[in-house]
Amino acid sequence: MRLHALKLPLILLNPAITRVPVRVLRSLNRSGKRALSSLETPGAGRWRALKLAKAWLDGELITRHRGQWVINSFLPPFPGKAFDRLFENLLSGRHLSPVSAFLAVTSECPYDCWHCSMKTRAGGERPTADWLRLLGELTDLGVSVVGFTGGEPLTRPDLPELVAAAASRGAAPMLFTTGFGLDAPLAKRLKDAGLWALCVSLDSHVPEEHDRGRGHRGAFDAAVAALRLSRATGFYTMSASVASCGYVEEKRYLPLYALARSLGVQEFRIVEPMPCGKLKDADSDALLTPAHVDELRRFHVETNRKGGSPKVCAFNHVESPELFGCGGGTQHLFIDAAGEVCPCDFTPLSFGNAFAAPLEPIWLKMNQAMGDNPRRHCFIQRHHKLVQDFAARSGEYPLPPELSCQVCEQAGSEPLPDYFAMITAGKGAGK
């Protein structure tokens, strides 16, 4: 038995971790708010739940960071306030409170990345007060993880204040950066503000290749320096690479992973190029094939099974139909620099502007339009041509709410991903 497989019993026997989930699940079972009885009584329901949990965690590496357990950056660390919020929100009766929200707090960026999803969106930068109000609405809505992105979020002088606002209200704040502009004094201010995790973009172990892909000379050196500083400051430290076809076919992720390990990175993230932003009109050759996806999923599982560091987090594995699927608009939301509320940063469907209207009705509209439940497949990968047809006719990007709802209606619903199918019906869904 692998050593890290023994961690799960230790976690489940820790009352600091299980106290709130057990209390919430018992309360929900008594009130009948959720069909959770099969998970709380002996028999086949519990066995199915344990079987799926085992299959999921078999490909994950649970690690410790500053006294907390971390599965991966999709979930908050535990025990902790943000983790407890996941379960306490179930008691509120709110319709599918979002687990996470990513905020593009600026569109300003000194880089020109080949895959940028923000290109063609409106630019600008809202004042501090607007974002502080919005952070209050997000945490009232039940968000557990708040990610600050851009543009380059480090260009905002008030970033520590925004981080502190999220942390003080019980969320786990994360920062996504190129590393540009990060120095020791700023890192300390972010740490004091409550930043939990820091993710730095790093696409290649070859400096010239990384600089070329990011459109900025010195990008590699800035990224490496930021990763070292992140570890020294005590953040949960992640690197993130965008996987081109050549990245997979030539196994460039292997020397990049070795570099990340040498820098003390704790999580090695791999994201697919998406048909949006700069790539919205790209042909299929720019996107990964099913064979590429299978290769990255294999790397995720096999590397994590070995128990070394860093753990691998390939999005196309975590968000696969066999696990959690696509939670854009039902478990996750994205707000761009202009305030447009979208399912994720890759899906240019706006359901309202959070600087012009209250957030909760916008969230509910988006949640219902996206089908009320997580989808088995990535929405933008499946329906980018439909989105582009609407964008070409309307000349708007992201699409306004009325057109976004029409896109969702034409896209239709999908069966639940296997995890959620098990929760609601005690069995997996079809492909």
Question: Language model features by range: what are they?
Answer:
Residues 28, 41-68, 75-189, 193:
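Conserved alpha-helical substructure of the radical SAM core
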Residues 1-30, 193, 203, 208, ...:
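Radical SAM enzyme [4Fe-4S]-AdoMet core and its adjacent flexible, acidic
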Residues 53-54, 346-431:
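Flexible mid-to-C-terminal extensions adjoining Fe-S/redox cofactors in radical SAM and related proteins
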Residues 1-78, 403-431:
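Membrane-proximal basic amphipathic "stem/tether" segments
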Residues 326-330:
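Short, small/polar residue-rich loop motifs at catalytic or cofactor-binding pockets
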Residues 108-118, 343, 376-385:
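Local cysteine-cluster metal-coordination motifs and their immediate loop/turn environment
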Residues 101-103, 146-148, 173-175, 198-200, ...:
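Hydrophobic faces of well-ordered beta-strands that scaffold small-molecule active sites
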